[in-house]
Amino acid sequence: ECTEETLKGLGFDQMSQEESIAVCEKIFSKYLDGHRLMSNAKHLRGSAMWLNFRRISCQKWSFGNVVLLGDAAHTAHFSIGSGTKLAFEDAIDLADELHLGKPLEQALKDYEDLRRVEVLKLQSSARNSTEWFENVERYLDFEPIQFAYSLLTRSQRVSHENLRLRDKNWLEGVETWFAGKATQ
């Protein structure tokens, strides 16, 4: 993720993939410790490597006996890593609805009604995460612990108390840090 200003200012929109990677290697050299950056976008050329995420939310997920699943019906920004999860859950719920022996039209309607709620929840989290990354400049002056906390809770899928379940000691350190800041 980067802002339009950064994309154009560094010339990424005009560079080849190799040139773009070379610039990023220079920018992040002190963190790469001599290692090279890798790209999984071998098939992309030029500015296509720098994609604007396309949010898809189809009004209807089926037509006749053709059914859309996953990203074909609804996308969730890749920053929350749930695209495959949504597709598999769609497939499972569709199979369950079809297995109940309902008329096809009713099974497809019930599948869509059931899945749409879960999809909207994840799309909302994905939107929050996307906005965090699109506005990352506002967090760059945070101290590392505050930046990490903000990053971990950006989608609102991971709450303060959920962090406690995941890493109690780390969160207690965050709370101590925040309390110290509040009393300065």
Language model feature labels by segment:
Residues 12, 28-31, 53, 63, ...:
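Phenylalanine-focused residue identity feature
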Residues 1-51:
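Conserved FAD/dinucleotide-binding core of flavoprotein oxidoreductases
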Residues 96-184:
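C-terminal helical "tail/cap" subdomain of flavin- and related membrane-associated enzymes
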Residues 47-128, 132:
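Conserved mid-domain beta->alpha element of the FAD-binding
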